[in-house]
Amino acid sequence: MNAKVAKALVLAGALLALAGTALVWHGLPGRPLPQEPSGPSAAATRLSLPAFALHGPRGAFANTDLAGRWTFLFFGYTRCPDICPTALSLMTEVKGRLAGAPAPVPQVVFVSVDPLRDTNALLAEYLAAFDASFVGVSGDDAALAPLAKALGVRYERHDSRDARNYTVDHSAVIYLLDPQGRLAAAFPPPQTPGVLAAEFRRLAAP
């Protein structure tokens, strides 16, 4: 392995490690928030994602559905009380800012880490409240693992006495994938529509 390749791998690994540390904790009284990094992180070398196969209201969703267009990707769940609605509202504003601009308008993909409760019907209804064009997908843990592991995403479900009433801790990073389906940038919180739109224009510029 030559020095340039080694350096690129180290930089890509550092980006994923930074993104993976942004973990959001819900419903855990007295448990401190982990320190989260701030500011966008553009990938020095764009990371190709492994093959994955998820599904959603529109049918199967795989790597081929990332090809040919830019994609903002976010992991969460529909019963998330704050972070997910905030992120999706932010993405609605980002899309509004990019409408009519020379750069192509990216697709927004919401990956649910709560497949037991987030049915296709619920995902469709939930996302339509923000933007009907948003794509909702999910899968069991085995199906989620390739994509989550590649991006450094962490999530953990917390059981309760009611098997269908529980919270989920999950990473709060918004990822940007290029038209080749590679990781181009990661945006840990705090996120603002102005920064995301500006970084997208910069990265998507010819």
Language model segments and positions:
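N-terminal targeting signals for export/organelle localization
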Residues: M1-L49, P206
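Short, hydrophobic alpha-helical segments
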Residues: F200-A205
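Solvent-exposed coil/turn segments that connect beta secondary-structure elements
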Residues: Y77-T78, V111-L116, D140-A142, G152-V153, ...
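Thiol/disulfide oxidoreductase modules built on the thioredoxin-like
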Residues: A143-E199
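Structural microenvironment flanking redox-active thiols in thiol-disulfide oxidoreductases
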Residues: T86-L147
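Hydrophobic beta-strand anchors of alpha/beta hydrolase catalytic cores
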Residues: F72-L73, V108, I174
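Short, acidic, Ser/Thr-enriched surface-loop or helix-capping motifs
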Residues: H55-G56, D178
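Short active-site neighborhood of thiol/selenol oxidoreductases, capturing the structured segment around
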Residues: F61-M91
